[in-house]
Structure formats: structure tokens, C-alpha cells
């Protein structure tokens, strides 16, 4: 988007990867993202003055420098509202009379919310006010998010769908040059085997145990399951594999550098993504770009836009291991079906790319500013 002549933009970072910030399992994979993230666009690191810097806490980011940055541009886009710094930017823009676009990937409100039911009730009241009254427009990454906001009373005309994307060209390039046979030799998996890949943190909300149990119940000959990731459930998952009697067909790879991840997808045949709380789910994008279909739970936001049943994958009820096992037992033996779905998956991603994201975002900014011309923001 930074190369688009319609906009002059600055990205402000209120935090950078730091051990002091990442103190929970949700951020255990930050060290494996080994691609340059600061090239090709103008950005600024804003000093954080929080006495207790930490992600996931409202006062973990206190960056008053955002106020001056907002003052220098025509429009302000804020992705989220969970930190005091974000509210500084929002309030500065409103006081200065500048359009404010807010971004959210929320797809539902957890009624339990870590044992704090009052937060769920508060959000049901906050979201309509925030997105109907405070924001000029709301940016969402998926149809799932759009439907959720509409269900809370946010007006549809105030919502702009800006596709959640990865670097399609980079991933496709790695996949095209990948040596499938060599990667499988590394895994100790036969070249004629059918491979299911699970790629996520081993956290309760990701439900990795469902992938193991469904794979075991499917009982497909010459099939293998790659568990790519790590996390608090790692030991219990290995114990589960032994209990299920599938240790000879399951591989745990640990965390994988992002620069190699496309090789892993390219050497696989289908992605399984079992999360119960996944506002979007970028592994679905990554897998489909590499030419493999995705089987996802109905709590994965990406499923609404990318998974076309029988063409680019399947959607099953979250937690229904039998339903997932049935899909695996039907799909894994059918190599022609997997190949065809893989080709359709790759084709689908040609219209869900950074180009579509940039176009949608710029259109939203122009709409918020009430004009169809170049914008500085």
C-alpha cells in the first residue's frame, strides 16, 4: 500500500518484539518470524513510557508520541482499542477533527472471558457505540467479523472488508522452489504417503488434541500427521499420541522458521485447523497459497471467505472429532480430489492478496474523508 500513489502513509509502532512484552504462551513464536518487516514503507517507533510494559494489559502501552503523529496527517487508522495508546490516538484525531478508522478482527464475544463475564456484557454495549459513534468507518479482515459486528447492531454501511492477507508472492515463490521429496525425507515420511499438517501454537484454544484424535479415528492407510508448533500442551500431546497408538505416523517438528514454512506446506497434502477461538487464522492463507486445501473448524474466521466446501476445503463443527475424522477418512485416500482442491485453493488466493487489501483500505480511507482523491494518513 505504501507504493500506491493515492496515499502518503506512516506506520507508528507502539511496541517492538521484546522479552519484557511477551510474557505468555500466545507470543512464543515471535522468534521464528525471520523476515524483514520494516522494509519498503515509512515507519516510526514511538517511545513507550508504561511503568509495566506488557502486551495484553491496557496500561502496557503508553505512547504519548502518537498524538503528535496524528496531528501531522489527514486521517488516522487504529487497529484495536485494547491499549491506552490507541485511545490517545483516537481522542487526538477526534479533537483535531480528523477521520478515524478503527480495525477489529473480532468474530464473537467469549461469554466466559477468563472468568470475567462482566467484560463480555460491557463489550456488547461498547462495540456498537465505538463503531457507530466514535469511528467514521470500521475495517474488518473477514466476513465473519462483519457478520459479528452487524449482529451487535453496528450498521453495515460503516463496515469495510479489508482482506486479512500475507505476502502471497513470497510464499508462492518458496513453495514453487520447494523440494517435496527432500522435505519428506527430513520428516522420515514416504514420498507416496498422504500428509496432514497442523500448524499452530499448542494452546488449549487451538485444540491440537482434536487433530490427533480425528487422525487416529480416520485410520487411513499410509497417512501421516505433521504437528508444527510448540506450546504448553506439547508434553500432553506426545502422551496422547502414545495412548492412541499412532506414534509411528505422527511427527512433532517444533517451531519452524517462517522462511521455511512454505516448504512444509508444499510437502503436505491438506491443512487441519481445529481452533475454537480464531478470529481469522493466517495458516489457511499460507496453506492455500501453497496449493493445499484446508479443513477448518467453524470457529475459524478465514473459513467464511476462503473455504468453499468440496472445492478449497471443508468446515466442521468445532470440537466434533467424529465429524473431522469422517472428512479425513473420505478425503485422504482420494489423491485426485486432494490435487484438484489444491489447485482450486491456489486459484482462490489470487483474489485474496495484498493488492485487494490495499485497494479496500484506500477506498475506506477515501470514503471516511468524504472524497475520492489522494489522502495523507
Regions found by a protein language model. Give the residues of each.
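Conserved acidic donor-binding segment of nucleotide-sugar-dependent glycosyltransferases
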Residues: 308-310, 314-321, 330-335
